[in-house]
Swiss-Prot record:
Keyword flag S-adenosyl-L-methionine: yes
TM region positions: none
Keywords linked to the UniProt accession: Cytoplasm, Methyltransferase, rRNA processing, S-adenosyl-L-methionine, Transferase
Example GO molecular function: rRNA (guanine-N7-)-methyltransferase activity
Protein name from the UniProt record: Ribosomal RNA small subunit methyltransferase G
Organism in which the protein naturally occurs: Dehalococcoides mccartyi (strain ATCC BAA-2100 / JCM 16839 / KCTC 5957 / BAV1)
Amino-acid positions noted as binding S-adenosyl-L-methionine in the UniProt annotation, renumbered to this chain: G74, F79, E97, A98, T99, A125, E126, R144
Designated gene of the protein: rsmG
Domain of life: Bacteria
InterPro entries recorded: rRNA_ssu_MeTfrase_G, SAM-dependent_MTases_sf
Record HAMAP family: 16SrRNA_methyltr_G
Localization, UniProt: Cytoplasm
EC number annotated for this UniProt entry: 2.1.1.-
Lineage: Bacteria, Bacillati, Chloroflexota, Dehalococcoidia, Dehalococcoidales
Amino acid sequence: MNELVYGLSALGISLNSVQLGQFETYYQELVDYNSRINLTAITEYKDVQIKHFLDSVSLVLAGIKGDEKLLDVGSGAGFPGLPLKILFPAIQLGLLEATQKKARFLSEITVKLGLSGVEIISQRAEDTAQNPLYRQKYSLVTSRAVADMATLAELTLPFCAIGGRVIAPKKGDIEEEMDRAATAVKKMGGRVFKVIKVELPGLEDGRKLVLLEKISNTPALYPRRAGIPAKTPLI
């Protein structure tokens, strides 16, 4: 885990032996499971350390606290939620993943990593956000999903409690995308708080963290039915 350790040193973070072992186990299980179902195209040891593990942990640049109640929307293979949980074991973590095979991997890897305080939710975000057990219950919501910011706002902000935040990793020039998302962010009860540049070893490719803050309740009609936020973004 030399690449990860080096990258984390730029953040002033060091891993103990337990955490290093967890990341090693995560890598081995990810590659093994990936041979059976498609979790990721990134499987080389060095690349996983940088493009999955370090990229996930880079969210600490947004000021993550160790006692967050965090929901990872469209978690896939567990990024960024599980690396953040390894780093901050006291986080209460929800991993929202609609694809059953991926959700099964998340359940298995959580056990193998010895993590507690993790809930796997295998449902669509649009449906889950209308459930009072999850709606406006989280201090922090993340999503690495490849989606337009207007769509992401509708799929993430309804989960945020007032005062909570969404952290959405993005790459490249996002000014036009953020302009398009302004209506959706406002309708969901949010505001664009800030955009943080990510400049870490191996991640010098224009990565950014978009931070949204929840400032008012999301109206009951949002999010719309499954599939609609992606097909017809609020722009």
